[in-house]
Amino acid sequence: MCIRDRFYDAYYGAIPTSELTAIIQYTQQRMLFENIGETFLGIAFVEMKHFDRLGDFIGQLGGRVNTPKYSSSAVTVEYESAAEAVRVNIQAEKDTIAAYQQLIERIRKNNPEKLTQSATVAIQLLNKIVSDERVHVRILSELAQSVAAEEGKEA
């Protein structure tokens, strides 16, 4: 599998860590949980930026993003509680970070002597996305504490 194909997976692949999966999941959750929906929507907007940038990069590599292989079966929107949704999202963000870090390492291994210009751009893009995903983990972790406190009051 070439690097461009791995970017397709990150972009809209039928995997839980794709940007399209994240966009759909967060926007669906926004409608399910009014009290924390705006946070989910804010994160979804950032995921949309990732989706856009990855699509641009795939185009720069000569790929086309007009024929998605996406399946909505990767999206989970049935939850017992807001706390469960937040936990699922934290894990998805962590899994996404790990997937992008693996992709960065693969790019480096494929360019052991000197990074090509496209490899350098790819790593910069992925590092920016990883940074954003780490912010999402922090935001969601804080949200998890808040939701747990709220749900504890209701019990």
Label every model-predicted segment:
Residues 4-155:
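Non-heme di-metal
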